A protein has these predicted regions:
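Bacterial N-terminal signal peptides that target proteins for export
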Residues: 2-14
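Bacterial N-terminal signal peptides
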Residues: 14-24
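N-terminal leader/targeting segments and the immediate start of mature chains
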Residues: 27-113, 117-126, 134-138, 146-149, ...
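An acidic-aromatic
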Residues: 32, 38-75, 128-203, 276-280
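Short, solvent-exposed coil/turn segments at beta-strand boundaries
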Residues: 104-107, 132-139, 157-165, 259-267, ...
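Short acidic, gly/pro-rich beta-turn/loop elements at beta-sheet edges
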Residues: 120-122, 141, 152, 178, ...
Length: 306
């Protein structure tokens, strides 16, 4: 039997065993049974070189993750191997890898899909956005793309101009008159629970590191679930963290963070409240460093509709 057939047979056997185990636990919900079966089916024996990594000190594991991401090694692994590897790593390896950074780029642009629960109501249509940003000084240009909620809107935040305000317009025939509004004003809060300056990989990273300290204090030592998967066209290692008390002590009762396979930042986020309802979903579809001069944050840019 060749390697491919062996792996297929192993996966089938693992799934069957997982299903039998779940049938022996009549109180377990059907959805959890299926999740357990899928998780068991994904686990494989690690190659010797990867197994050795999991026995190294945590600092070495974090350094290896950075090298493996940069060289494309992580992206070359199949989902089952990625899942098993990240389950076997020291629980502090990923936080250290993330903390060591870099968690973004000095100047970059990205497209993202964002969906939130605003004032208790889940948005039926997600925002689809193009974002350009520099970090020093902090400047952000955001455009809401066709097909998403609030399509046609544009906004610019430039900390060298006004630190507490952004300049933007609502788009459409009646919304092309630009105006200055507060970063946390009523108009901004009506569309998002976050400020425009929070757009970017750095905000997600900082939130993860801050929450991580609270996870440890609460006895949450490792993710409750690890799974390599593709979300919205983006392949990630999804790390699920569930907290004992949820909000307001923690940002979310359950958080699912999709780790990029090439850099130490997250590409996807799903956040759930204490009742198990999702209140935030983010997918950073494409991201790349970019050279952005002053015109990228100038409302007079001919490519913009201010």
């Amino acid at each position: 039997m060749n390697a491919g057939k062996k792996r297929s047979a192993w996966h089938a056997a693992a799934a069957a065993v997982a299903c039998m185990l779940s049938l022996a636990r009549p109180g377990l919900p059907h959805a959890q049974e299926m999740a357990d079966a899928a998780s068991a089916a994904q686990e494989v024996a690690l190659p010797a070189d990867l197994a050795k990594i999991t026995r190294d000190p945590v600092a070495q594991q974090a350094r290896w993750l950075r090298t493996a991401a940069q060289r494309g090694t992580l992206a070359q692994l199949d989902d089952a191997t990625l899942t098993t590897l990240f389950k076997a790593l020291d629980p502090l390896a990923v936080p250290l890898y993330i903390r060591n950074g870099p968690n973004g780029y000095p100047s970059y642009q990205f497209t993202m899909v964002r969906q939130e629960r605003i004032s208790g109501k889940w948005s039926d249509t997600p925002d689809h956005m193009l974002v350009k940003t520099t970090r020093e000084p902090l400047r952000v240009y955001a455009k809401w793309l066709p097909g998403g909620a609030h399509a046609g809107q544009e906004t610019i935040y430039d900390t060298t101009q006004r630190k507490d305000e952004m300049y933007g317009h609502l788009g459409g025939l009646l919304g092309k008159i630009p105006l200055w509004t507060a970063l946390d004003g009523a108009l901004a809060r009506a569309q998002s629970n976050h400020q425009v300056k929070d757009l970017g990989t750095e905000f997600i990273t900082n939130l993860y590191l801050t929450e991580g300290k609270k996870y440890q204090e609460a006895g949450v030592q490792r993710p409750t679930r690890v799974e390599a998967k593709t979300i919205g066209g983006v392949r990630v290692v999804a790390l699920t963290y569930e907290t004992p008390t949820g909000r307001p002590q923690f940002y979310a009762k359950k958080e699912v963070l999709g780790l990029d396979l090439h850099a130490p930042y997250f590409r996807t986020v799903e956040s759930y409240d204490n009742d198990g309802r999702i209140f935030e979903r983010i997918i950073i579809e494409k991201i790349a460093p970019a050279t952005l001069d002053d015109t990228a944050f100038d409302p007079k840019n001919p490519d913009y509709a201010f």
